[in-house]
Amino acid sequence: MNTIAPNLDGKHLRIGIVQARFTNEIGSEMLKVCCRTLQELGVADENITVATVPGALEIPIALMNFASSEKFDALIAIGVVIRGETYHFELVSNESGAGVSRVALDYNIPIANAVLTTENDAQAIERIEEKASDAAKVAVECANLVNLLLEEQFEDEE
């Protein structure tokens, strides 16, 4: 059996991050943690590009434009959706998540989805460190995996 080991070496990877500004205090902290973790994994600061958008529903369009540029090995979505008193929470959560997944599959690019969906601010704050750090690790690991699989695919065609 062939097994591909996880590779968390971010050296030479280019990462795009889209952060929703709605609930910006939490999102900004997530962005800091995410960027710090990427750098700890070896991603050069000049290889990290950050764009901000108004809210979670706008994340997929920015990700799509990053993906279509073919300048990135992986992308990261950062944001916070906190339940209110209306159905709007479900709409935003579901549509944002579906859009992120659609971009990843349509453009064959790994996207780490760190859009938190919580009941309140306290739950979101509690998850900042873990979820933002995890997103960086997922992006690096999946970028390396996809790059390796693409290399093997092209080697097989030769």
From Swiss-Prot:
Reported EC number(s) for this entry are 2.5.1.78
Q: Which gene is annotated as encoding this protein in its UniProt record?
A: ribH
| Gene Ontology MF terms in the entry | 6,7-dimethyl-8-ribityllumazine synthase activity
Pathway assigned to this chain's UniProt record: Cofactor biosynthesis; riboflavin biosynthesis; riboflavin from 2-hydroxy-3-oxobutyl phosphate and 5-amino-6-(D-ribitylamino)uracil: step 1/2
Q: List positions binding 5-amino-6-(D-ribitylamino)uracil.
A: 22, 56-58, 80-82, 113
Question: What's this protein's name?
Answer: 6,7-dimethyl-8-ribityllumazine synthase
Give the annotated active site: 88
Function of this protein?
Answer: Catalyzes the formation of 6,7-dimethyl-8-ribityllumazine by condensation of 5-amino-6-(D-ribitylamino)uracil with 3,4-dihydroxy-2-butanone 4-phosphate. This is the penultimate step in the biosynthesis of riboflavin.
Q: Which reaction does it catalyse?
A: (2S)-2-hydroxy-3-oxobutyl phosphate + 5-amino-6-(D-ribitylamino)uracil = 6,7-dimethyl-8-(1-D-ribityl)lumazine + phosphate + 2 H2O + H(+)
The EC category is transferase
Listed A to Z, the keywords are: Riboflavin biosynthesis, Transferase
Task: Write out the similarity annotation.
Answer: Belongs to the DMRL synthase family.
Protein's UniProt keywords contain Transferase? yes
Q: Which InterPro entries match?
A: LS (IPR034964), LS/RS (IPR002180), LS/RS_sf (IPR036467)
Q: Which GO terms describe its cellular component?
A: cytoplasm; cytosol; riboflavin synthase complex
The record's section on CDD domains has: Lumazine_synthase-I (cd09209)
* Any single biological process term in GO: riboflavin biosynthetic process
**A Pfam family assignment:** DMRL_synthase
Record has Glycoprotein as a keyword: no
